[in-house]
């Protein structure tokens, strides 16, 4: 019993001690609260000052002029180009075939080789044709002798009839015999010429100048004049043509360009429209419009001496049809599109901006031709446009576009 009482007293004493320690702790820290409040006030005051400073900075920033870049419009001569998609086509394409039947004895070309008209390309076994020629020549010689004999007899008959040693009927018969022999001789001469022609055909030559394709038959095969694939295909690449299309609305423009006396200049560009491949001239225009596409076909011719164009190659075409003289040219970056159409921001002498509606026609690279609403030597904004308002004053910063750039070409936009 005494042990339990002692344990209870110890627990009570421990609780009292803990309570005293807690009380002393709070009584020692509570005087620091005013200092803390002062520090908090100081921080609050400092924060307020910063807020005030930031507000002033924003107001100062609002008073800063919006930076823009500008360029000056100019008057220039701008070539007017029509664009189209085209396919390179050979000026002439020939499937080389034999004109006679026989065994192919030799091929005198390499695949992909450039050949000239008249070059020997293949040979057919000539022996059968040489035999036919010899026979025809022999028959010709025989009938020539027959004719000579008939002519001599006719000369004698003409003398004898004068002395009445032969009848007139015999003279007429001999005259007919001579004429018959002459006819036979002409037939023989034709047979000789035909045999000679067949022999000549055994040597196959290039009918045009061009590039040899892949051979369609090997040496040793028996070929005929009716073979569909022939021996090889020759395509003429010097010069070469491009067939392309333009909208039917441009027909009058093209016809006017042709009336100038010089065929319009045509440029061929690669598939990506990044590299100029060759330059030629317009050759011809089709005589009807494609009702399905509303376009018309045109053909241009290129020298192609550097083999830049290849048959069936896809190219982009630009054809010069006119030159716009004294056209007002502005950077295309200055022209914007709004609800009311195209417009630009112009700068006055006080660097104040104002919006002006414009009409444009053709464009090339960084330049666009302005046909209405803008004159030459006017300063227009090219960058920083999204920050502009009517009548706002701006700060013009240097730009590469502030220097005049010569207009060199144009396309319809």
Swiss-Prot record:
Gene name tied to this protein: mdtA
Upper classification of the organism: Bacteria, Pseudomonadati, Pseudomonadota, Gammaproteobacteria, Enterobacterales
InterPro entries: CusB_D23, Multidrug-R_MdtA, RND_pump_MFP
Disordered, as annotated region: 32-59
GO cellular component, one term: plasma membrane
Cell compartments where the protein resides: Cell inner membrane
GO molecular function: efflux transmembrane transporter activity
First and last residue of the signal peptide: 1-32
Keyword tags: Cell inner membrane, Cell membrane, Membrane, Signal, Transport
Main subcellular location of this protein, as a coarse class: membrane
Protein name: Multidrug resistance protein MdtA
Family: Belongs to the membrane fusion protein (MFP) (TC 8.A.1) family.
């Amino acid at each position: 019993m005494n042990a339990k009482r002692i344990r209870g007293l110890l627990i009570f004493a421990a609780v009292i001690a803990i309570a005293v320690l807690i009380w002393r702790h709070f009584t020692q820290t509570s005087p620091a609260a005013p200092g803390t409040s002062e520090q908090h006030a100081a921080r609050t005051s400092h924060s307020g000052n910063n807020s005030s400073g930031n507000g002033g900075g924003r107001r100062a920033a609002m008073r800063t002029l919006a930076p823009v870049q500008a360029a000056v419009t100019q008057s220039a001569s701008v070539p007017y180009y029509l664009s189209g998609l085209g396919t390179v086509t050979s000026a002439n394409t020939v499937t080389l075939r034999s004109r006679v039947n026989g065994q192919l004895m030799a091929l005198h070309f390499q695949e992909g080789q450039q050949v000239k008209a008249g070059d020997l390309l293949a040979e057919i076994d000539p022996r059968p044709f040489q035999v036919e020629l010899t026979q025809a020549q022999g028959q010709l010689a025989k009938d020539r002798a027959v004719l000579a004999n008939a002519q001599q007899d006719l000369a004698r008959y003409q003398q004898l009839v004068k002395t009445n040693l032969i009848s007139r009927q015999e003279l007429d018969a001999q005259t007919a015999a001579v004429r018959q022999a002459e006819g036979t001789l002409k037939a023989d001469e034709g047979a000789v010429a035909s045999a000679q022609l067949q022999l000549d055909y055994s040597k196959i030559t290039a009918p045009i100048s061009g590039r040899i394709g892949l051979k369609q038959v090997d040496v040793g095969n028996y070929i005929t004049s009716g073979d569909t694939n022939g021996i090889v295909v020759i395509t003429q690449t010097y010069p070469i043509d491009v067939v392309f299309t333009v909208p039917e609305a441009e027909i009058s423009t093209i016809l006017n360009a042709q009336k100038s006396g010089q065929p319009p200049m045509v440029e061929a560009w690669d598939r990506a429209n990044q590299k100029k491949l060759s330059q030629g001239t317009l050759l011809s225009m089709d005589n009807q419009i494609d009702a399905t596409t509303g376009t018309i076909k045109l053909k241009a011719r290129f020298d192609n001496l550097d083999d830049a164009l290849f048959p069936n190659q896809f190219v982009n075409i630009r054809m010069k049809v006119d030159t716009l003289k004294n056209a007002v040219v502005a950077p295309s970056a200055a022209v914007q599109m709004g609800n009311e159409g195209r417009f630009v921001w112009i700068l006055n002498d006080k660097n104040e901006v104002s919006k002006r509606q414009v009409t444009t026609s053709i464009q090339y690279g960084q330049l666009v031709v302005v046909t209405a609403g803008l004159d030459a030597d006017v300063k227009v904004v090219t960058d920083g446009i999204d920050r502009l308002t009517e009548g706002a004053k701006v700060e013009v910063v240097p730009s590469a576009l502030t220097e005049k750039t010569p207009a060199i070409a144009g396309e319809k936009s």
